[in-house]
Design a protein with these regions (language model features):
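Hydrophobic faces of well-ordered beta-strands that scaffold small-molecule active sites
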Residues: 54, 141-144, 169-173, 200-204, ...
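Metal-dependent enolase-superfamily TIM-barrel catalytic cores that perform enediolate-based chemistry
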Residues: 131-247
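Shared catalytic-loop signature of beta/alpha-barrel
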Residues: 218, 224, 235-344
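Short Pro/Gly-enriched beta-strand edge/turn motifs at strand-loop
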Residues: 20-28
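Short beta-strand elements
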Residues: 40-46, 338-340
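Metal- or metallocofactor-binding catalytic centers and their adjacent structured scaffolds
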Residues: 8, 13-15, 45-123
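Conserved, mostly hydrophobic/aromatic
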Residues: 11, 49, 112, 125, ...
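Flexible C-terminal active-site loop/helix
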Residues: 2, 6-10, 14-21, 33, ...
Length: 367
């Protein structure tokens, strides 16, 4: 019988750093173009010597200053308290009653939440997925490291390269070009390059008006796409519900949903057929687990957005887990990136979430 006492950790201090990493394939989307991407690295130090780690992807470097300040402020409020993510999450959310529970406030909570879960798993000597009651193993993934709104003549070669990166069986293409004819041409180029057996997701990055989406999605509805992602502005749940009800291709939203209650509002509105929460907006590990319970009860599939390392652990304890979104943006600053093989990400059998910083790279990318 194991008589080891339960792991008890106490939050001591938090160290937050900002880096900016060049992208292997620049983002070209309706919401903007990016050649570099900022990251916020959070290290939660405990009095027991265990350090939990997480990173955020705030999109714009100009946003990092305010987010870092909030992380540090919230950490100071929790200093000296038990590393108990559920308790700290509730405490932080209650503190926002008068300020609101969305935007950068929830993003700061997510940074601390993920790092605390990492610390607990490390202290327990277990991979995060095992601490959560699951098992280490592969998680099927699609490759979204390209196929942005690039010139159509480049689409075929890029699709072939993306499949070859890890024998991927699924890719994501960005749509919403100047005309539906151009969207159809881009889809045809992908099919010509990789064949009909490769699953193809599509993402509009909120680039269409409701009426524009209604026209265009009906014209694309027979293309055999896995889903239409965020065709219209993310918080128009009523508009999304109308589109989802009219189309045979599943409608996917979720990366811009803030927290479990906002997630429940989307589900109650029948805003989509499937959901893909983003860990920094949904509220970290705790926010994901609560949202996944809602999705499971409703029978709605859950895919991930960004954060493939933490997300892999969570997918293996999510009842309606569907697809993990693979992006390699974190690889340049991680000491031991996760293995990608046969269209799946493989969770390493090591304590915690499995991430650690390559300090030389962090120093090189610091801003």
């Amino acid at each position: 019988m194991n008589t080891t006492p339960p792991v008890r950790l106490t939050l001591d201090k938090v160290v937050v750093r900002v880096i900016q990493v060049p992208l292997r394939r620049p983002i070209v989307a309706k919401l903007g173009e990016f050649k570099n991407f900022p990251f916020i690295l959070t290290d939660v130090h405990t009095k027991e010597g265990v350090i939990g780690q997480s990173y955020l992807e705030p999109y714009r470097a100009s946003a990092t200053k305010s987010i870092v300040a909030l992380i540090e402020d919230m950490a100071e409020q929790q200093r000296g308290k038990r590393v108990a993510p559920f308790d700290r999450f509730e405490e932080a959310m209650r503190s926002l009653h008068l300020l609101g529970r969305q935007g950068v406030m929830l993003i700061a909570i997510a940074a601390l939440d993920m790092a605390m879960w990492d610390a607990l798993a490390k202290a327990s000597g277990l991979p995060l997925v095992v601490l959560l009651g699951g098992s280490v193993g592969p998680v099927r993934a699609y490759n979204t490291n390209g196929l942005w709104l690039i010139p159509i003549e480049r689409v075929a070669d890029e699709a072939s390269a993306l499949v070859a990166e890890a024998n991927f069986k699924a890719l994501k293409i960005r749509l919403g070009r100047d005309s539906v004819k151009d969207d159809l041409k881009a889809i045809a180029e992908v099919r010509r390059a990789v064949g009909d057996d490769i699953i193809l997701m599509s993402d509009f990055n909120q680039g269409l008006s409701f009426n524009g989406a209604k026209r265009r999605l009906h014209q694309l509805d027979d293309q055999g796409l896995e889903w239409f992602e965020e065709p219209i502005v993310f918080d128009d749940f009523a508009g999304s519900a109308r589109l989802a009800n009219e189309l045979k291709t599943p409608l996917q939203i979720g990366e811009n949903i803030y927290g479990p209650r906002h997630f429940l509002q989307a589900v109650a509105a029948s805003a989509a057929d499937c959901y893909m929460p983003d860990l920094e907006r949904i509220g970290g590990v705790t926010g994901w687990l609560r949202s996944a319970a809602i999705a499971g009860a409703a029978g709605l599939s859950m895919s991930t957005h960004l954060y493939p390392e933490f997300s892999a652990h969570l997918m293996r304890v999510t009842e309606t887990a569907d697809w993990l979104e693979w992006r390699d943006w974190g690889v340049p600053f991680l000491a031991e990136p996760f293995e990608l093989r046969d269209s799946a990400i493989h969770i390493p059998d090591r304590p915690g979430a499995g991430i650690a910083w390559d300090e030389a790279a962090v120093k090189r990318f610091a801003i």
